[in-house]
Amino acid sequence: MEYTYLGRTGLRVSRLCLGTMNFGVDTDEKTAFRIMDEALDNGIQFFDTANIYGWGKNAGLTESIIGKWFAQGGQRREKVVLATKVYEPISDPNDGPNDMRGLSLYKIRRHLEGSLKRLQTDHIELYQMHHIDRRTPWDEIWEAFETQVRSGKVDYIGSSNFAGWHLVKAQAEAEKRRFMGLVTEQHKYSLLERTAEMEVLPAARDLGLGVVAWSPLAGGLLGGKALKSNAGTRTAKRADLIEKHRLQLEKFSDLCKELGEKEANVALAWVLANPVLTAPIIGPRTVEQLRDTIKAVEISLDKEILRMLNDIFPGPGGETPEAYAW
């Protein structure tokens, strides 16, 4: 496994991040334990989750599964760089009228305590804002996070799904307080979704943030099975997406065959080739999927292959640099 620094921090993390969103939903607890053991055995020590995972009435279930795995011992917790998120409501009846989306000091304090309890740990390495809060002032948000960092319950703060200007605003407000602020941004990024190249990646590069890519396989479209799936089993939305990108996916599949590599691994290797990217998040449902995916870090894409991929999946922006989006 390869390792890199988490943004501008001195903390090193694996180039693949284990996503756990399926745990307790599509992946049962026993299989989730095996996946986490296998990941750690192969050097993947960067794990990502969120307090909302498990979804609906089961919100928090994924964190609980990870906590049970930590409780098995074997230095599991000590070996993992753990990231979780806050923002969404998790149907806690004690929250009353505050059971809503947001990043108030009240919510961050209460929901961090809930995450720590479910995860059976006393600290989180990377605590992430799952979305931007347009209502709560930055003074309150940063006061909440600073308090948790000073208490030792949180090491670093990250964001997720922020626009480029949100990152700049957040950092400017943190600097006023002489606080480190953000160290990462988690963002949707793949060969099929390159919008982040217009604003988010340039902002992250300038601010010294590591970018963690979610949905690097574009919801499975780049996984190699989309074109082979039974049309009768597809949802209307899925069928429309496949038809929209059919020509691109066919060309991509042909290129991967020439390279002798699986589509999913080439798609991940492309993300890894971007120097702004810390790691793509992989979300295996089975141990077998994880074993296949780990091979992505061994693939090196030369300039010609990167050019060919860019021809198949052109980035955004047109003729003007970064589209002058700001």
Curated annotation (Swiss-Prot):
It comes from the Bacteria. GO terms for molecular function: oxidoreductase activity. NADP(+) binds at S215, P216, L217, A218, G219, G220, L221, L222, G223, G224, K225. The keyword Plastid does not apply. SUPFAM superfamilies: NAD(P)-linked oxidoreductase. Keywords: Coiled coil, NADP, Oxidoreductase. Residues 242-305 form a coiled coil. The active site is at Y53 (proton donor). One of its GO terms (cellular component) is cytosol. InterPro entries: AKR_Detox_Biosynth, NADP_OxRdtase_dom, NADP_OxRdtase_dom_sf. It holds the Pfam family Aldo_ket_red. Its EC number is 1.-.-.-. It is an enzyme of class 1 (oxidoreductase). Belongs to the aldo/keto reductase family. Aldo/keto reductase 2 subfamily. This is Uncharacterized oxidoreductase YrpG. It comes from Bacillus subtilis (strain 168).
